[in-house]
Every structure is written in C-alpha cells, then in structure tokens.
Amino acid sequence: MALFDTHNTWAFVFGLLGNLISFAVFLSPVPTFYRICKKKTTEGFQSIPYVVALFSAMLWLYYATQKKDVFLLVTINSFGCFIETIYISIFVAFASKKARMLTVKLLLLMNFGGFCLILLLCQFLAKGTTRAKIIGGICVGFSVCVFAAPLSIIRTVIKTKSVEYMPFSLSLTLTISAVIWLLYGLALKDIYVAFPNVIGFVLGALQMILYVVYKYCKTPSDLVEKELEAAKLPEVSIDMVKLGTLTSPEPVAITVVRSVNTCNCNDRNAEIENGQGVRNSAATT
C-alpha cells in the first residue's frame, strides 16, 4: 500500500484536512481526563462513548488495510485507537468498582469478542474486494447506528425551544469534519467512506439551523425541566457522533447538569462538559 495517493491530489488534500480536524476532535476530551486525574474520580462521566469510539476506529483501521492509497485513513484511525485506549485506561484507573466492571465487560464483548469475530469471519470466509466490501458495509452500518445518537437532543431542542444543551461550536466542528471526509470519500470514489458522512453533514446542518432558529427564544424553566425528564437527559451522558474521525464517527459525551435558574437562551443555566466519543465512524465517518 502506497503511503500517499500521488495520483489523486484532491484525495490527499481532503484527507490531510480531515486528519487535522479529527486530531483536534480526538484531543478535545483531554481537559476532562486531566480533571479526572486531578480529582482521582470519574464523577458522572461514562466510558461508553470511548469504548464505542475505540471499536469504530478499529473497524475503520481494518477496512483501511484492505484498500490501496488510503494512508491518511490509516493515520487518523491509528491515532484514534491510541488515544481512546489511553482515555479508557485512565477511566478504569479512577472509576468506581461498578463502572470499572461495566467498562471491562464492554471491552471484552465489543472490542475483543466482536472485533475478533468480524476479523476471523472476514479473513477466512472472504477474499480480495469481497472482503473489503463486507468490512465497509459493517463500518457503514455501525456508523449509521452511532449517528442516531444526537436525535434525542435534537428532539429536546425542538420541544423546549432551547439550545442550552447543544453547543454551536461542537456542531459546527463536526459538520465541517463530515464535509471534509465526505469530499475525501468522493475523491477516492469510496462509497463506504462517503455515505456515513452524508448523514453526518445532514444532522450537523440540522443542529446548526435549530441553533439559529431557537437562539433568541425564551422558554419557561418548568417546560425545559419537563422535557429533560422525558428525554432522561439529567446527569447522563449523551453520545454524539464524532464525525471527524473515520471511526465514525466517534461519539462525544456531554454531561448535562440541571439548574434551577430561569431559562433564557442567552443565559447558560447548565454546565456542559464535553468529552469524547466521538463521536465520532470518526471520526469521522
């Protein structure tokens, strides 16, 4: 496999840009884990987004090894596997016994058992382009499932007419990332890379539109509280696709803390902690 596709300049340009954005997205949880290390507790954070992000990066890395001239796809997902492993290790070190056991079970079931099963079946039952298509299909299917994660927060924004729990900067970054990786997939004529990012772009654009529409809306605090209860948002982590990493996106964990203050879209009544998982399919895709 050639390191760079010298015959496709646009693929190289978009792949390089995608790597830069995705590297930044992968590193976004660093302040969160610095806080965990400093306080020696995981507080209300969950490990699921990071376990899912690692699994997604592993799948896309395996897919990349079956293709030619996709070195930039290898680099971003290799980094994703590395950084997510560090995040999970820190989480396990400082988590409660219950959270630690849950994380270990998820790793054994998904990242070890699930990935090994896919690896063995694809290696022994499929060859050449057929194997790449099967792995690509699995990556796309997993990415689409992860992309459904932000739908609950979108529903809450529409019903409460409040964007307090949907940071615009995060939505903008992930949308740009999805566009870059979409263009990369189109430049390579790779439907498996391009398709998940079409969904990522649509959802990202929808979030930004909702932000603009409801930015200046005033919503009674009791309505916001009611909708948050219905959506089960308080004190939990919401997995948002990290579109910028072909791990499909890696999900991003956002911990929402309710406030008793009056809700005004221009006044923050909640502390939002951004963490990673993503995210993501990668990542991006």
Curated annotation (Swiss-Prot):
Q: Return the InterPro entries for the record.
A: SWEET (IPR047664), SWEET_rpt (IPR004316)
Extracellular face: residue ranges?
A: 1-9, 65-70, 127-133, 189-192
State if Repeat is listed as a keyword. yes
Q: Which residues lie on this side of the membrane: Cytoplasmic?
A: 31-43, 92-105, 155-167, 214-285
Q: What happens when the gene is disrupted?
A: Under high-light conditions, plants lacking both SWEET11 and SWEET12 are defective in phloem loading and display slower growth, mild chlorosis, and high levels of starch and sugar accumulation in leaves. In plants lacking SWEET11, SWEET12 and SWEET15, severe seed defects, which include retarded embryo development, reduced seed weight, and reduced starch and lipid content, causing a wrinkled seed phenotype. Altered sucrose efflux involved in the transfer of sugars from seed coat to embryos thus leading to starch accumulation in the seed coat but not in the embryo.
* Single biological process term from Gene Ontology: seed maturation
Residue ranges occupied by any MtN3/slv domain in the UniProt entry: 12-98, 134-218
Main location class: membrane
Q: Write down the Gene3D superfamilies for this protein, in alphabetical order.
A: 1.20.1280.290
Which tissues does the record link to its expression? Expressed in leaves, especially in phloem. Expressed in developing seeds.
Record's subcellular location = Cell membrane
Describe how expression is induced or repressed.
Induced by the powdery mildew fungus G.cichoracearum and the pathogenic bacteria P.syringae pv. tomato.
Q: How does the record say this protein sits in the membrane?
A: Multi-pass membrane protein
Signal peptide (UniProt feature, chain positions) = none
Provide one Gene Ontology cellular component. Answer: plasma membrane
List the transmembrane segments: 10-30, 44-64, 71-91, 106-126, 134-154, 168-188, 193-213
Q: Which UniProt keywords apply?
A: Cell membrane, Developmental protein, Membrane, Repeat, Sugar transport, Transmembrane, Transmembrane helix, Transport
Q: Show the GO MF annotations.
A: sucrose transmembrane transporter activity; sugar transmembrane transporter activity
Q: What does this protein do?
A: Mediates both low-affinity uptake and efflux of sugar across the plasma membrane. Involved in phloem loading by mediating export from parenchyma cells feeding H(+)-coupled import into the sieve element/companion cell complex, thus contributing to the sucrose migration from sites of synthesis in the mesophyll to the phloem. Contributes to seed filling by triggering sucrose efflux involved in the transfer of sugars from seed coat to embryos.
Q: How does it assemble?
A: Forms homooligomers and heterooligomers with SWEET5, SWEET11 and SWEET17.
What the record says about family reads: Belongs to the SWEET sugar transporter family.
- This protein is called what? Bidirectional sugar transporter SWEET12
Q: Which organism is it from?
A: Arabidopsis thaliana
